[in-house]
Amino acid sequence: MQVLPACQSSALKTLCPSPEAFRKLGWLPTSDEVYNEFIDDLTGRTCNEKYSSQVTLLKPIQDFKTFIENDPIVYQEFISMFEGIEQSPTNYHELCNMFNDIFRKAPLYGDLGPPVYMIMARIMNTQAGFSAFTKESLNFHFKKLFDTWGLFLSSKNSRNVLVADQFDDKHYGWFSERAKTAMMINYPGRTFEKVFICDEHVPYHGFTSYDDFFNRRFRDKDTDRPVVGGVTDTTLIGAACESLSYNVSHNVQSLDTLVIKGEAYSLKHLLHNDPFTPQFEHGSIIQGFLNVTAYHRWHSPVNGTIVKIVNVPGTYFAQAPYTIGSPIPDNDRDPPPYLKSLVYFSNIAARQIMFIEADNKDIGLIFLVFIGMTEISTCEATVCEGQHVNRGDDLGMFHFGGSSFALGLRKDSKAKILEKFAKPGTVIRINELVASVRK
């Protein structure tokens, strides 16, 4: 079994999968035409005087708008970030109207990608946008927006998308053949109904809400995602999330610049200056990002004890500074700016950190960071501090939107990351091996 060698100096290998890989995973629209049609339709319905006069903004959106107008610095940033932007939203009034439309609906399966990111992409890509979107006070309001959307997505009223219908030429219900094909791409020869707990003979396959569907459970984990090597082998470290590899880094620094091209982890920022941080200096990290249609629960990578769980408030729409001003939409030779920012995002975004002390002392303490990306409401742990878990046991889940995760090893850990994950966009199946002890 090949492993990645330890590096003698700081080394970061940003895998940066191709735009086509991101597109297949639902992070990008399938074409500029799809994006333009979405924006034109949303603009036509919401960016006009009739909508503004007849439709009441959801309270958190009105609070968001009031905050912008009452804070002189934030107000000027919201004026500046829209300068030169010709396609709606062209001002914060239109942005709030678009939020008001999106946050009243559950996402459909389709060719677009995350809808909130689609309307935020251009203003994220400005210096004024970066300045505004890194402010704690503004992110407090973003969290309120997503919490409100989350309440709707957890309600029975969100189930209208859990059907086999085609809504228009680019949007489908989640039980349409097109959507099922996308969801089952990494389960060859299997069907949705056989892999996940549901009942195709009752309305909505028995799911109580969109979020219930989003966090679906395996019917038989041992068949579709077995714990590779068996639970009793404590020398093995499994994948915590179903994902694609994005980054492998060794000799990670306690403090590192967050603005360099190529990205770098800064442990003090990534781990929110936790007292455990020094143990991971010069250690290794593997990071993956999740398919929009993927399984969104987390499994334990080791047999061990949950030592600490930390919820970190952070940003939602701040892309890496070196990417600001890059072309949007980008060509197929390079991902768009936001998707070149995943390492940076892990340092500053809203996230949950989980420390686990492995039973095997050759592994010792590890960390997991579960990171929300754009329209993500919460990261929810379903375990508690002091609880013992086995490899493959449930740890928690992402809610509502796109996500990334990182797993960190101490410098003194005898576990090494498998070499296969050095390939861009390598599929990481939950419960498969990502590292193993080598003495």
Curated annotation (Swiss-Prot):
One of its GO terms (molecular function) is phosphatidylserine decarboxylase activity. Pathway: Secondary metabolite biosynthesis. The keyword Lipoprotein does not apply. GO terms for cellular component: mitochondrion. Pfam families: PS_Dcarbxylase (PF02666), PSDC (PF12588). Its EC number is 4.1.1.105. It catalyses: L-tryptophan + H(+) = tryptamine + CO2. GO terms for biological process: phosphatidylethanolamine biosynthetic process; psilocybin biosynthetic process. The pharmaceutical interesting psilocybin as a treatment option against depression and anxiety is being investigated in advanced clinical trials. Coiled coil: none annotated. Keywords: Decarboxylase, Lyase. Belongs to the phosphatidylserine decarboxylase family. L-tryptophan decarboxylase; part of the gene cluster that mediates the biosynthesis of psilocybin, a psychotropic tryptamine-derived natural product. The first step in the pathway is the decarboxylation of L-tryptophan to tryptamine by the decarboxylase psiD. PsiD does not decarboxylate phenylalanine, tyrosine, or 5-hydroxy- L -tryptophan (5-HTP). 4-hydroxy-L-tryptophan is accepted as substrate by psiD as well. The cytochrome P450 monooxygenase psiH then converts tryptamine to 4-hydroxytryptamine. PANTHER family: PHOSPHATIDYLSERINE DECARBOXYLASE (PTHR10067), PHOSPHATIDYLSERINE DECARBOXYLASE FAMILY PROTEIN (AFU_ORTHOLOGUE AFUA_7G01730) (PTHR10067:SF9). This is L-tryptophan decarboxylase. The lineage of its organism: Eukaryota, Fungi, Dikarya, Basidiomycota, Agaricomycotina.
